[in-house]
Amino acid sequence: KRGESQVITFKIISTDEEYLDEKIFKKVVKYLDEVVNHPLVIDGGFKEEYVAIEKENLKNRIESIINDKGRYAVERAREEMFKNEKYGISDLGYLADIDKITAKGLYEHYVNIMKTSPIDIVVEGNFDEDEIVEIISNGFDFHRENIIEIPRADFIKKVDEIKVIKEEMDITQGKLVMGYRCNVDYKDEFKYYSLFVGSNVLGGGPHSKLFVNVREKESLCYYIYSSLEKYKTSMFISSGIESENYDKTVELIGEQLKSLKEGKISDEELLNSKSAIISSLKTIKDSLGGSSDFYFSQSMGGTNTTVEKIIEMIEKVTVSDIVEAFKNIELDTIYFLSNNKEA
């Protein structure tokens, strides 16, 4: 899921033809086309046995989320924060809906998706571009009609009232999640990457304000970090705390964000954050499929910016740029999962 868009991804990996005695890319595309456009269909639907297996697998995945209390807390915070928005819908769906899925209904839904949804094809590797474009153009048996235009997610929203959600569970460590609306247009790339650097200064690792001041100096949490969601330009701060430290932790997190917004960022904090981000960006091309995932994400955002260009922007970010990017950020939701009824 990217923002408010549910994304279905098919991936196939093959050996570089340079190391083979024959050209295989046409065969690779044909195989992928068979999987995507000609799946096994029986009596107008997917095979019942396969659907039943996948329904159970999905149930298990949904049920397993609760075993990872940190992830569960973030999911619940997101669900509450975006309750009346598409982004609040779980990417895995809900247990109550799974039994309603039929083999025939699922296949009909799949066919409709393949006919009407936008499709991006990304190829990563060592190849002749013109040859690859020709093979792909002729290699897929898509049947397209009435292609829908997916609207851009709303990213600007005024917070009328901060939501505070407290829930209880049999756990040994409380989970605190604070959700913020950044109110920044990600298509304003320099401002977005200024926001990105600022988020890293705030909670991006051992060098960050939250880690140093909340975890190390005050010993209020077991872990703490901040993360951004690009397409909704929202930020979540997540931490594991003792229930009795709830009020103090919320207060201190607020103080660290206030410090950031006031431009109280040292040269060391800024340099460490930039270095961490740039090092991460440079590894994209080192991982199998890293570049294709990156450029698909860029395509979805309508930006199509290279890694090198992003690094240039990161290097140019100043403290005043961060202050400007964080100018309109607002706390929207506080979610606390506790084992203490008095928390």
Predicted segments, located by residue:
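Short, low-order "capping/linker" segments at domain edges
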Residues: 59-66, 161-175, 278-288
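Phosphate-proximal small/polar/acidic motifs at interfaces that engage nucleotide phosphates
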Residues: 152-156, 193, 211-212
